[in-house]
Amino acid sequence: MGHQEIDIRRVIPAPPRAVFASLLDRSTWPAWSGHDAFELVRPGAAGPYDVGSVGLLRSGRRVMREEIVEVVADRRISYRLLAGLPLRGYRAEFDLAPTTEGTKVRWHSSFDAPPGLGWLYVAALRRFTGRLLDGLAERLRDRATTTT
């Protein structure tokens, strides 16, 4: 297995609190992320989307089972993939930082891919996550214009 890392950055025109809330509440993801559905399998210790929370994200026939492993309010959400892709040790973080334009989001993931397929998973995850972040930016931009 070959070790892979992906790093994607976007500036989202919304405050960190709004970006964080949308990323943490995975029940909203089908509206903007490119996923078809979300199902909460197990709530976290301190709330439905806190550390220990396990959920299923469906995209077509693919179902990914993910667990939230770290939450730092308005700053970071980390999760690990439990099932759904043939990757080992998959872990990803959304890191948030305020900017004058809104929130800088950094999505970083690392994993071990099957031999010869690392490039394919890097390309697919980079494309999918880029669209996810673009969808989030559009959702929050639309929300801001309807509330002002």
Segments from the language model and where they lie:
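A conserved amphipathic terminal alpha-helix motif
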Residues: 110-148
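Hydrophobic ligand-binding cavity/cleft-lining segments
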Residues: 1-45
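Glycine-rich portal/gate segments that line the openings of hydrophobic small-molecule binding cavities
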Residues: 31, 40-84, 135-148
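A mid-sequence interfacial segment
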Residues: 93-119
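Hydrophobic/aromatic beta-strand elements that line small-molecule binding cavities or substrate pockets
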Residues: 8-10, 64-70, 81, 90-98, ...
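Short, cysteine-centered beta-strand-loop-beta hairpins and adjacent loop/turn segments enriched
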Residues: 60, 86, 113-117
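Intrinsic-disorder/low-complexity, polar/charged segments enriched in Ser/Thr/Lys/Arg/Asp/Glu/Gln
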Residues: 3-9, 54, 63, 76, ...
